Design a protein with these regions (language model features):
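Beta-lactam-recognizing serine transpeptidase/beta-lactamase-like catalytic domain environment
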Residues: 1-26, 31-277
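Generic structural signal for hydrophobic residues
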Residues: 32, 103-104, 294, 298, ...
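Ligand-recognition elements built from short beta-strands and adjacent flexible loops
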Residues: 130, 275, 297-430
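Short beta-turn/strand-loop junction motif enriched in small, turn-promoting residues
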Residues: 169, 280, 414-415
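C-terminal, active-site-flanking charged/polar segments
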Residues: 265-269, 273, 277-313
Length: 430
């Protein structure tokens, strides 16, 4: 939700993720493909003529944004390369030319693409989906093909993400929420359970098929440049023209919007994410080269900090770690130590309520936290501490600290228990 002020500086100006609805462009192709699959109108291995990336719909010309040089290919491949021509032709031929535009609109509504998410934050607009053949909605012969590629519809980033999250969640659509529980002094005082919007937005077969399509986009399509060797993600790139209008024989474009919506890990999704960049200023404006790198950075950082996403290096029974690999005689702030050990799921027993503690390994595969005495007006024992904790304690006592080495404190020049009177203490780290 970073915006740019007139002076060129960036600021949290407006909650665009919730409050700004735009024509999404190619990320909406997922909905078009899922509608076709749900109505059993296409097979992913069917052939489709992409006409080299240029086609005519009545008096309007449609061009594929990213050149691909393909003519006849599979429906699957047309989606991977994000062919406007391919997806638009499929929807036009199966719904438009057969007079079944109402069936396509019904499917979009089945996917809840015409409804708010209901998030408890003010300012969410209702997504815009035209009513079939409505003069009031300016329905025309090009409406269906244009809707299929993300035009003549509007949706917010959060609403689009809710749809993609449902696909990642095997069809179950959940209401977005920001708060899971409220705690006071470490105790939960109120919980907010997850709320299901719809148990299944499409059949299992259709969901399985579009999940494969989204994985294909990353493996072989418009997102392959940024696929990861450490984990697999799935998603769809999007590039949309903004404020466009026809002036005679040419089209005037007022700007672009780049986006990427996806989830990871692809085989067992835990996180979904959408990145939307309105009017990028880098000189490029394609979703695959502007928004996708941002998604990848977010996914990389999330993956690196979630230990549950890493595979165990050893599938054999755990070796006894006590006195070998578990920390022993390490000293630190008790609450910090407890937080780290809990996060790493290392069993421990706390035997002190004091501020500072020392870790001791037991004979079994566990730890115990014991009291580390910090007498007032006397030099404490900081051996085993990290430098940050040692400096905090010693400098607050009025001592001057000299440091040699890196790591944890191995030796200190002044004996613990010595009365403090502004001396200089030297710490040897290792």
């Amino acid at each position: 939700n970073i915006g740019q002020r007139k002076n060129g500086k960036y600021w949290e100006i407006y909650n665009d993720a919730i409050g700004t609805a735009t024509e999404p462009g190619s990320t909406y192709k997922l909905a078009a493909m899922m509608a076709l699959l749900e109505d059993d109108l296409v097979n992913l291995e069917d052939s489709i003529d992409l006409e080299g990336g240029i086609s005519q719909f009545y008096e309007e010309e449609l061009i594929d944004a990213v050149p691909h040089g393909l003519d006849t290919t599979t429906v699957w491949r047309a989606f991977e390369v994000s062919s406007n021509v391919g997806i638009a032709k499929l929807v036009h031929e199966n719904y438009g030319l057969t007079g079944k535009g109402d069936k396509f609109i019904k499917k979009l509504k089945d996917f809840h693409l015409n409804l708010k998410t209901g998030i408890e934050i003010d300012g969410e607009p209702k997504p815009y989906v035209k009513e079939a053949y409505s003069e009031e909605d300016d329905w025309s012969g090009t409406t269906l093909p244009w809707m299929s590629i993300g035009y003549e519809v509007t949706i917010t980033p959060l609403q689009l993400l809710t749809f993609y999250n449902a696909v990642a969640n095997d069809g179950k659509m959940m209401k977005p929420q920001l708060v899971k529980e409220i705690q006071q002094y470490g105790e939960t005082i109120q919980k907010f359970p997850a709320v299901q919007i719809k148990g299944r937005i499409a059949s299992k077969h259709s969901i399985d098929q579009v999940q494969r399509l989204l994985e294909g986009v990353v493996e072989n399509g418009t997102a392959k440049k940024y696929k990861s060797s450490r984990y697999r993600f799935a998603g769809k790139t999007g590039t949309a023209q903004k404020d466009y209008k026809k002036l005679g024989d040419r089209v005037s474009v007022g700007g672009y919007q780049a986006s990427f919506a996806g989830y990871f890990p692809a085989e067992k999704p835990k996180y979904s994410c959408v990145v939307v960049i309105i009017e990028p200023q880098s000189g490029d404006y394609y979703g695959g080269s502007v928004a996708l790198p941002v998604f990848r950075k977010i996914a990389d950082k999330t993956f690196a900090t979630d230990v549950d996403l890493f595979k165990a290096l050893n599938g054999k029974p755990r070796p006894i770690l006590a006195k070998k690999q578990l920390p022993d005689y390490d000293v630190g702030h008790r609450q910090d130590v407890q937080t780290v050990l809990s996060y790493l799921k290392v069993p421990f027993e706390t035997r002190t309520s004091k501020e500072w503690s020392v870790i001791r390994a037991t004979e079994s595969d566990s730890l115990k936290l014991l009291r580390r005495s910090m007498p007032e007006e006397k030099v404490p024992n900081v051996v085993g501490m990290g430098l940050r904790d040692a400096l905090y304690i010693l400098e607050n006592l009025g001592l001057n600290v000299e440091i040699d080495g890196y790591g944890r404190v191995k030796r200190q020049s002044i004996k613990p228990g010595t009365r403090v009177h502004g001396q200089t203490i030297r710490l040897r780290l290792n």
